[in-house]
Curated annotation (Swiss-Prot):
<dbReference type="Pfam" id="PF25506">
    <property type="entry name" value="TIM-barrel_MTC6"/>
</dbReference>
<feature type="transmembrane region" description="Helical">
    <location>
        <begin position="560"/>
        <end position="580"/>
    </location>
</feature>
<comment type="function">
    <text>May be involved in telomere capping.</text>
</comment>
<feature type="glycosylation site" description="N-linked (GlcNAc...) asparagine">
    <location>
        <position position="482"/>
    </location>
</feature>
<feature type="glycosylation site" description="N-linked (GlcNAc...) asparagine">
    <location>
        <position position="240"/>
    </location>
</feature>
<feature type="glycosylation site" description="N-linked (GlcNAc...) asparagine">
    <location>
        <position position="341"/>
    </location>
</feature>
<keyword id="KW-0472">Membrane</keyword>
<feature type="topological domain" description="Cytoplasmic">
    <location>
        <begin position="581"/>
        <end position="615"/>
    </location>
</feature>
<dbReference type="GO" id="GO:0016020">
    <property type="term" value="C:membrane"/>
</dbReference>
<feature type="glycosylation site" description="N-linked (GlcNAc...) asparagine">
    <location>
        <position position="250"/>
    </location>
</feature>
<feature type="glycosylation site" description="N-linked (GlcNAc...) asparagine">
    <location>
        <position position="326"/>
    </location>
</feature>
<feature type="glycosylation site" description="N-linked (GlcNAc...) asparagine">
    <location>
        <position position="415"/>
    </location>
</feature>
<dbReference type="InterPro" id="IPR051008">
    <property type="entry name" value="Telomere_Capping_Maintenance"/>
</dbReference>
<feature type="glycosylation site" description="N-linked (GlcNAc...) asparagine">
    <location>
        <position position="127"/>
    </location>
</feature>
<feature type="signal peptide">
    <location>
        <begin position="1"/>
        <end position="17"/>
    </location>
</feature>
<protein>
    <recommendedName>
        <fullName>Maintenance of telomere capping protein 6</fullName>
    </recommendedName>
</protein>
<feature type="glycosylation site" description="N-linked (GlcNAc...) asparagine">
    <location>
        <position position="176"/>
    </location>
</feature>
Length: 615
């Protein structure tokens, strides 16, 4: 029995330990370094508006074109979402014959036949033949997104996503000669129902998670009232960092809520955009409804700026921004113009000019959100232990923040001790006459983040580097003192000029403006930024060495049930065994011992029948 209880306690301890890892995801595994990079870049971006939060996307058309328009082509989507893909671009076709939205680029003849074992059929339109499943709809895509959102719906893992529609038409010119065409493609069988009636219907499965134009309007109205009721004059010194960020980005062309507000206060996980509308002009064309406008962002509300890798416009934009400086200063106005211009800035590749590691890094750093559209990315299945081509080739290039392989300490580090609780400030060091200098030189604590020419890297907090000071009211204006170096523990806002504070970039444009300042002032890397994981390993926070990790150990209900189930089963088995022991088990040794002594005493008294007290 004791052995069973010991086994139970071991299993229970293992299960409870498993309930609260820092990452609690299901599905294809993602290496720890990538998870930490994804989460930390998201956390850094929390105070900035959601339209400035960089993401990477994938075009589903590339999967459909290479594998056919069926649900099997979506098998990689969940795995890609786990690998830091947060955008899904979809070509959506308005079928003028049936007045439905569908994913297949060709109409289905009304006499089409298919079997449950082979649902994919060949359909032709405009001199092209497609393999399409009539049952395929946007619900197949949205159900995968819904599962991913549910599986990651914790403060630790939740990210903000984008669904992007390209609207197209299955169009024909109506005439006497097209009567037979209409008869062939008009929907006649009510049991054969292909597509959705409205745009709003295509995303109805995700309705509770969508940040809508209606919510944006409510936020803007509320923000306007708060601004009018508060004082119009605020001293710069009284602003904390969050207020300073809000004050700067409130000058944007479109006032948007922060990622923190949207993701962790309103609990919204995605936006839906129509990024292009190429529907043919026709009396049978789809008419955008009021309900659509309340749910989906169109270009007149939130515009999209789309670049293509085979077009020089995106490269020209990046070149101008990365060279926005001269011998005397950085062109802050140009960086601010880009930062405050509210657009969905996309760069899309293709088979002729796919992304390279260098081009992808360039586009991400200068403010573009890449969308992988080349068919080469769909050639490999994404399973547990088998990552996608995108992840294998471009993981390090999807981040505007971290350098390749980061966040991580140095390779083969055998003495990476972390004496971070007992450090000496610059003030106590001065009072000791600099006696702590030698002690600091022997300390190692790879817990602080420095900017290098390749991006952020985890560095030894006791090293003395230059440090980044950011203007409180102008997010792209930085000061770097080439004559002053500090270790991370000695840094505070007093080391920066008036109106500046020790800070870090929170967007790709802020990052680029800092790196441009480094070039303009001709200073050397590395440079300290306000980011560390001192209090909790791999929980990167800003606010100095005393900043606390904001996360409690949380887990979704579904995951908690799945993880506690083994312990519950073991506990029930042990309870049943205890019950069976109490009911059915007897101890023969104890029972015989009782009977034997009772009989022996009775026989003794029968032979020795004393009366009175023996002498």
């Amino acid at each position: 029995m004791i052995g069973l209880l010991f086994v139970f306690s071991v299993l229970l301890s293992f299960s409870v330990g498993y309930i609260f890892p820092f990452s609690t995801s299901n599905g294809p595994t993602v290496n720890d370094t990538l998870q930490h990079a994804i989460r930390s870049q998201r956390d850094v971006s929390k105070p900035i508006p959601i339209d400035r939060v960089e993401f990477s996307g994938v075009s589903l058309s590339s999967f459909f074109e290479s594998e056919g328009y069926s649900s099997d082509s979506l098998s990689n989507l969940y795995g890609l979402l786990k690998e830091n893909i947060a955008g899904v671009m979809i070509d959506l076709y308005w079928n003028e014959f049936t007045s439905k939205w569908q994913l297949c680029p060709a109409p289905f003849p009304n006499n089409i036949t298919y079997t449950s074992s082979n649902r994919v059929v060949d359909v032709s339109w405009n001199n092209r033949t497609y393999k399409c499943d009539p049952n395929l709809s946007t619900d197949d895509i949205m159900s995968i997104l819904n599962n991913f959102i549910r599986d990651t719906n914790t403060d630790v893992e939740a990210n903000f996503m984008h669904v992007m529609y390209n609207l197209k038409s299955i169009h024909y010119k109506k005439s006497n000669q097209t009567i037979n065409l209409e008869n062939a493609y008009k929907e006649k069988n009510s049991n054969f129902n292909v597509g959705m009636d409205t745009l709003n219907d295509t995303v109805s499965l995700l309705s509770s998670y969508i940040f809508t134009p209606l919510l944006l309007e409510q936020y803007q109205s509320s923000s306007s009232k708060n601004a009018n009721s508060s004082s119009s004059i605020r001293y710069i010194d009284s602003l904390n960092e969050t207020q300073a960020i809000q004050k700067f980005y409130n000058q944007s062309t479109i006032l948007m809520p922060s990622l923190q507000t949207t993701l962790l206060t309103q609990y919204k996980r995605l936006m839906v955009h129509v990024i292009s509308n190429d529907m043919a002009e026709s009396s049978r064309s789809y008419q955008i409804s009021f309900s659509d406008k309340e749910t989906i962002f169109f270009n007149n509300v939130f515009p999209a700026m789309i670049g293509h890798t085979n077009n020089a416009s995106a490269d020209d934009f990046c070149y101008e921004l990365t060279h926005a400086y001269n011998g005397t200063d950085v062109n802050i106005m140009e960086f601010n113009r880009v930062s405050l211009n509210s657009t969905l800035r996309l760069i899309i590749d293709n088979d002729k000019t796919p992304f390279t590691t260098d081009s992808l890094s360039k586009y991400v750093r200068c403010g573009y959100c890449p969308v992988f559209n080349s068919t080469q990315y769909s050639s490999q299945k994404v399973t547990e232990g088998n990552s996608s081509i995108i992840s294998q080739e471009f993981t390090s290039n999807l981040f505007w923040s971290w350098a390749p392989g980061q966040p991580s300490g140095p390779d083969n580090c055998t003495n990476c001790t972390r004496p971070v609780t007992n450090y000496t400030s610059k003030y106590s060091e001065a009072s000791n006459g600099g006696s702590d200098e030698e002690e600091h030189s022997n300390n190692i604590a790879y817990k602080c983040v420095a900017l290098t020419e390749n991006g952020w890297e985890v560095s030894n907090c006791y090293e003395k580097y230059l440090f980044a000071c950011q203007n409180k009211l102008s997010r792209n204006e930085w000061k770097l003192d080439n004559y002053t170096k500090r270790n991370y523990f000695d840094l505070d806002d007093d080391d920066c000029p008036e109106g500046y504070f020790f800070s870090l970039p929170r967007s790709n444009i802020e990052m680029l403006s800092l790196m441009t300042t480094v070039k303009q002032e001709n200073v050397s890397y590395p440079i300290w930024i306000d980011l560390n994981d001192i209090t909790v390993e791999n929980c990167f926070v800003s606010g100095g060495p005393y900043a606390q990790c904001p996360y409690q150990e949380t887990v979704t209900t579904d995951k908690f049930v799945r993880m506690i189930a083994p312990s519950f089963v073991v506990a029930m088995v042990v309870l049943v065994l205890i019950f069976l022991e109490k009911v059915f088990r007897k101890t023969p040794i104890q029972t015989n011992r009782k009977r034997y002594w009772k009989k022996a005493i009775q026989e003794y008294y029968a032979k020795n029948d004393y009366e009175g007290v023996p002498s």
